[in-house]
């Protein structure tokens, strides 16, 4: 999928932008805090119906403005044009349309425009809690498996209902409790199977890319951990119902799954240096891109690279440049404060690129070939 052009109105600090884009490499240059990341986030929004950073939709509307609009025209592999529109006013729900027709459910849109976003905040995958790593799995799998989205929604609904029963002062209805436990188990087993299969396929891709970037300096891996590995999920959930009642929430289930990130036999969060951590998450995201490219056979994902070169040594930067300049990558958006990094990528490219200068939310074409 190729984003041909994009129009943005009142999205964060971008008051107005109307840009024609390169089908290969698009570079955005500017100081920190001028709007480069906000531009990438607007592209992300058109793929996922939400911001990568702001959980509340109204937070993306520019200050002192009452509405925002993002509209993009995409070209698929058959050269069909897909028009994607999102508009929202403060205090009302957003409108999301494909070719002028509004979606009944936003989940119907997920996966149409596969995308991987690599940003400095990705280090939270190593440093943060397990919810960040579960979200990583959810975001990728949801882009190629609609049944996963449905199972995840059903599981979370059942979990919420069971937790509400656990919090009750009086003794909850056992029959009702069992209904929600069965719903959790049924959907949870499906989520476990799909996560397990995804991680199994992702590991060799991830290790290969990490070796390329690091120059074979370290051995890394991933380990998926789930309560489903202890036996049938329904048994695991019901086994400690008394403890769950005492704390007021569900202690077991796939909502507690984790994706352990390892260097050698140790957790990255304890052993990894700053450069190793950044290399790890970058390789992980690029492996997700490669996985989606192989899995979603009808289209190549968009790749957003936000300030990825900071805190990496020259050898790793060179390896990344070599990697993303290859034929396996489709349309790429790259931001940086340092023009030198981008020039090296452009030198390796086939010459099809555009450079945009960003300042104070204004985005202007600086150069194209």
Locations of the language-model features?
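Post-Walker A helix-loop "phosphate-sensing" segment adjacent to the P-loop in P-loop NTPases
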Residues: 44-56, 287-295
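Walker B catalytic acidic pair
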Residues: 306-308
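Conserved NTPase motor "head" modules and their coupling/switch loops across ABC/AAA+ ATPases, GTPases
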Residues: 1-31, 175-186, 190-302, 311, ...
């Amino acid at each position: 999928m190729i984003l041909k052009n994009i129009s943005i109105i009142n999205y964060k600090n971008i008051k107005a932008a109307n840009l024609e884009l390169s089908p290969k490499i698009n570079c955005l240059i500017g100081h920190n805090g001028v709007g480069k990341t906000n531009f990438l986030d607007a592209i992300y929004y058109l793929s996922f119906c939400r911001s990568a950073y702001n959980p509340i939709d109204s937070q993306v509307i520019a200050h002192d403005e009452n509405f925002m609009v993002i509209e993009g025209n995409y070209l698929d592999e058959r050269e069909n044009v897909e028009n994607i529109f999102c508009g929202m006013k403060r205090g009302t729900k957003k409108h999301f349309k494909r070719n002028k027709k509004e979606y009944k459910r936003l989940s119907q849109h997920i996966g149409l425009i596969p995308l991987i976003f690599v940003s400095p905040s990705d280090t939270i995958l190593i440093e943060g809690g397990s919810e960040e790593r579960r979200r990583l799995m959810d975001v990728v799998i949801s882009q190629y498996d609609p049944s996963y989205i449905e199972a995840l929604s059903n599981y979370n609904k059942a979990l919420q209902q069971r937790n509400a029963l656990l919090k009750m002062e009086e003794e909850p209805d056992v029959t009702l409790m069992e209904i929600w436990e069965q719903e959790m188990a049924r959907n949870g087993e499906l989520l476990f199977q799909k996560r397990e299969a995804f991680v199994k396929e992702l590991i060799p891709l991830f290790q290969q890319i990490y070796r390329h970037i690091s120059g074979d300096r370290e051995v890394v891996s991933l380990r998926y951990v789930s309560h489903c590995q202890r036996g049938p999920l329904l048994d695991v959930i019901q086994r400690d119902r008394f403890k769950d009642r005492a704390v007021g929430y569900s202690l077991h289930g796939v909502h507690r799954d984790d994706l352990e990130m390892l260097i050698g036999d140790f957790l990255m969060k304890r052993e990894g240096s700053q450069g190793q951590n950044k290399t790890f998450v970058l390789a992980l995201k690029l492996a997700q891109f490669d996985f989606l490219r192989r899995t979603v056979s009808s289209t190549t994902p968009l790749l957003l690279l936000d300030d990825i070169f900071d805190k990496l040594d020259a050898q790793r930067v060179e390896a990344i440049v070599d990697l993303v300049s290859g034929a396996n990558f489709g349309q790429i958006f790259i931001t940086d404060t340092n023009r030198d990094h981008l020039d090296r990528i452009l030198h390796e490219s086939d010459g099809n690129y555009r450079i945009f200068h960003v300042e104070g939310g204004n985005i202007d074409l600086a150069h194209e070939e």
